[in-house]
Swiss-Prot record:
Pfam name, any one: Guanylate_kin
Reactions catalysed according to its record: GMP + ATP = GDP + ADP
Function: Essential for recycling GMP and indirectly, cGMP.
Domain Guanylate kinase-like: 19-197
Residues holding ATP: G26, A27, S28, G29, V30, G31, K32, G33
EC number from the UniProt entry: 2.7.4.8
UniProt GO MF annotations: ATP binding; guanylate kinase activity
CDD domains linked to this entry: GMPK
Keyword Lipid metabolism tagged: no
Major site of localization recorded for this protein: cytoplasm
Protein name (database record): Guanylate kinase
């Protein structure tokens, strides 16, 4: 059972000394992987490698991008309650092993998950407000279609399935704490760094924040999902 937060710290933030659990999610093709690599470069964070039953894409490395397993191996792990979350997406299974995540959080190391939206919501249900959900959004569905087509790894039918699912996910963007539009990589990286620094600062009283932490909080507030209008989301799915 999680300890309650001290009164000088916002409810739901992890205890001081415990790592942050940052969950990055979004539609396939939105650029999560590239963004995550730039954001975490040089950082001492624990990046959780998901298990999956899908086939590796060209250039993917087992154990770095995913742990590629058979359906039987995946099912056995799930039956042992070995996943923090797991979900099926476009015919393949994805899951996040729980043991290494808890160990990293306990030693004060920030943990980053890059997972599907369904899995992200499972993490939120299980971890509550300690799970910092960041939704990466495309500037438009037209741009997302272009990126998916350009990868040349999906059939037209699967691309249409991904776009249909992406439309639903974008319209539910207010379910996440933060929403970052990935139309400019440098800006998106800066916003992710600000979110991380602001959430770390939230573990202590605001009067103890440094000027850099105050600046990070101000930038992070601009990408809170509450700052995004329904009209803006509708514009993304219709463009």
């Amino acid at each position: 059972m999680m300890a309650s937060a001290p009164q000088d710290r916002p409810a739901g933030t992890p205890p001081q000394g415990r790592g942050l659990l940052i969950v990055v999610t979004g539609a396939s093709g939105v650029g999560k992987g590239t963004l995550r690599e730039r954001w975490l470069a040089g950082q001492d964070v624990f990046y959780s490698t998901s298990w999956t039953t899908r086939e590796p894409r060209p250039g993917e490395v087992n154990g770095r991008d995913y742990v590629f397993v058979s359906p039987a191996e995946f099912l056995a792990k799930a039956q042992q309650n070995g996943f923090l979350e797991h979900a099926q997406f476009v015919g393949n299974h994805y899951g996040t092993p729980i043991e290494p995540i808890e160990a990293a959080l306990e030693r004060g190391q920030d943990v980053v998950l890059e997972i599907e939206v369904e899995g992200a919501m499972q993490v939120k249900d299980r971890m509550g407000e300690q799970a910092i959900l960041v939704f990466i959004m495309p500037p438009s569905l037209t741009e997302l279609r272009r990126r998916l087509t350009g990868r040349a790894t999906e059939t037209p039918e699967r691309i249409e399935k991904r776009l249909t699912r992406a439309r639903d996910e974008i319209q539910a963007a207010h379910d996440f704490r933060y929403v970052i539009v990935n139309d400019n990589l440098d800006r998106a990286v800066s916003e992710l760094l600000a979110v991380q620094q602001a959430e770390r600062a939230a573990q202590k009283a605001a009067e103890h924040w440094t000027p850099e932490e105050q600046q990070a909080r101000a930038l992070a507030d601009t990408v809170r999902s509450t700052a995004l209008s329904r009209e803006a989301l509708q514009q993304v799915v219709e463009s």
